[in-house]
């Protein structure tokens, strides 16, 4: 109807005729093309920001959370360490409403370790991607499908799992 009648915006009003929003043709198109986009309760795309495991990680994540990110990703080449879990616990202690995703890992033991520490999501992948140098530099890596299967079986869908690299569609 919008396109046929060359109407750019469709007002959304309450019973009292108070304007509460506008719908555009591109809004409808986005809904049709990307029905499972990760959005917040207001319909906005959720935003995550990655931090490393450094001396200023807590300060950086605090600034990111104050700016409105929905999730923090603790991004490290080897997520199965006490230092990573220490940072995870520190962030969870002060930011209960913010999802904390942690990775990368490649084993069921590491997944359980992060899950027990409070991770809201887990990134899987040690050396699987085409631009990743971990296998060359460190001499270690796990085939991506094997790592994902191992991790998913061990945590039984308790948190989302992200496959980070090594998969072609």
Would you name each region that the model predicts?
Residues 50, 117, 139-163, 168-169:
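Alpha/beta catalytic cores of nucleotide-metabolism and tRNA/nucleoside-modifying enzymes
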Residues 2, 10-12, 17, 28, ...:
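Terminal peptide-recognition signature
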Residues 18-38, 56-60, 76-100, 105-116, ...:
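Active-site-adjacent beta->alpha loops and helix N-cap segments on the catalytic face
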Residues 1-6, 13-14, 29-32, 56-65:
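The conserved cystathionine-beta-synthase
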Residues 9-11, 50-52, 70-81, 99-104, ...:
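Catalytic beta/alpha-barrel core
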Residues 40-50, 91-106, 121, 154-165:
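Short beta-strand/loop segments at the ligand-binding rim of alpha/beta enzyme cores
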Residues 46-58, 62-72:
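Active-site beta->alpha loop and helix N-cap motifs at the rims of alpha/beta catalytic domains
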């Amino acid at each position: 109807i919008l396109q046929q009648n060359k109407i750019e915006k469709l007002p959304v009003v309450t019973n009292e005729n108070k304007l509460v929003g506008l719908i555009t043709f591109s809004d409808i198109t986005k809904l049709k093309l990307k029905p499972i986009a990760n959005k917040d309760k207001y319909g906005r795309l959720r935003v995550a920001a990655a931090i490393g495991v450094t001396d200023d990680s807590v300060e950086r994540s605090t600034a990111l959370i104050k700016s409105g990110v929905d999730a923090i990703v603790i991004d490290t080449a080897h997520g199965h360490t006490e230092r990573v879990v220490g940072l995870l616990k520190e962030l969870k202690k002060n930011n209960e409403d913010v999802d904390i995703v942690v990775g990368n890992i490649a084993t069921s033991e590491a997944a359980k370790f992060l899950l027990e520490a409070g991770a809201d999501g887990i990134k899987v992948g040690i050396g699987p991607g085409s631009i990743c140098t971990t296998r060359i530099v460190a001499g270690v890596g796990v085939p991506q499908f094997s790592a994902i299967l191992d991790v998913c079986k061990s945590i039984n869908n308790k948190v989302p799992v992200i496959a980070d690299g090594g998969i072609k569609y």
